[in-house]
Amino acid sequence: IGIDYKMNYMKKPFLFLLFVLAAVSCKEVEAPQAYGPVPTEAQMEWQEMEMYAFIHFSINTFTDIEWGYGDRDPKLFSPTELDCRQWAKVCKDAGFKGIIITAKHHDGFCLWPSRYTEYSIKQSPWRGGKGDLVKELSEACKEYGLKLGIYLSPWDRNHRDYGTPEYITYFRNQLRELLTNYGEIFEVWFDGANGGTGYYGGTNENRCVDRKTYYDWENTYKIVRELQPNAMLFSDGGPDCRWCGNEDGWVGETNWSLLRRNEVWPGYPNYTELRYGHEDGTHWVPAEVNVSIRPGWFYHESEDHKVKSLQQMVDIYYSSVGRNGTFLLNLPIDKRGLVHETDVKRIQEMTAALKADFTINLAEGASVIATNVR
């Protein structure tokens, strides 16, 4: 009994010593403090989406042009087989996580029955003038488990007040409509193209604006924060995610998620900087790579044979997602109101190729040595 007692007595300081050493060891490998800007939870969730679709569809689809002037008759918008469920199914099957729709492009034509203008689908023959394309897409996205994003062009070549303070009120009213009537929005997309020639209510003139100050962006962004607090705000300079500085499907091999955000705005002239970000950036503003599956953003029958090759599509994935960006692939809706068969086939091929690439786990069985663990 005496021996056992002595051994137990000696164990106590030994165990205490082990405890002290363990505590010191843990202290030595505490997680380091973050260096510089870090992503928000919303930015992390957005980055993990990897791929999502851009949908360009408007009067331009029926006039065979890219940028509408703002003077075309709404009755030209007349899809015969429009099916947002087909769009959503194509995207879901491809592994895309969401869809961003051009609710209003530069010509000012609205794909929802806005109460603030007559230049919308309510003046078209589609659905007898009672349709709401944004609503139909919202419902299709919910059915297929996809997120919905909204593109709203700041420039409006149809509106008579563009270039005046009154237009900003109009623009914000439409933004509120889109952010309150269609459920949760994951991204709001503001284009950098602003100002130039247009119909402008019949004046047919050139109107230039100060892209940096005209829209009073900070107060415009506040509307999004208020109505859709989890939505990502996209423009050339963020504030949440940025343009990649080209429409060719790549971001720089060195691609910082940082940006000196206060120096950049929608329509920023030195946009080539955005291909790489700023190593000394003040804010976390990751890059989004937007590219079309065809040469144009809107559908043109003449481009049916110009769809990007499988190799091009796979290369774009690795030059976007593979370089610390996201991949926003544009699918132009055709005159029927469908994703064209040629485009669908190419997307399916890309999905199969990427799946094959990632089937083999190259890290399986590898040995990893760490100098410190916690």
PLM features: residue spans?
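Sec-dependent N-terminal signal peptides
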Residues: P13-A22
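Mature catalytic domains of secreted/periplasmic carbohydrate-active enzymes
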Residues: V29-R374
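Positively charged n-region of N-terminal signal peptides that target proteins for export
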Residues: K6-P13, C91
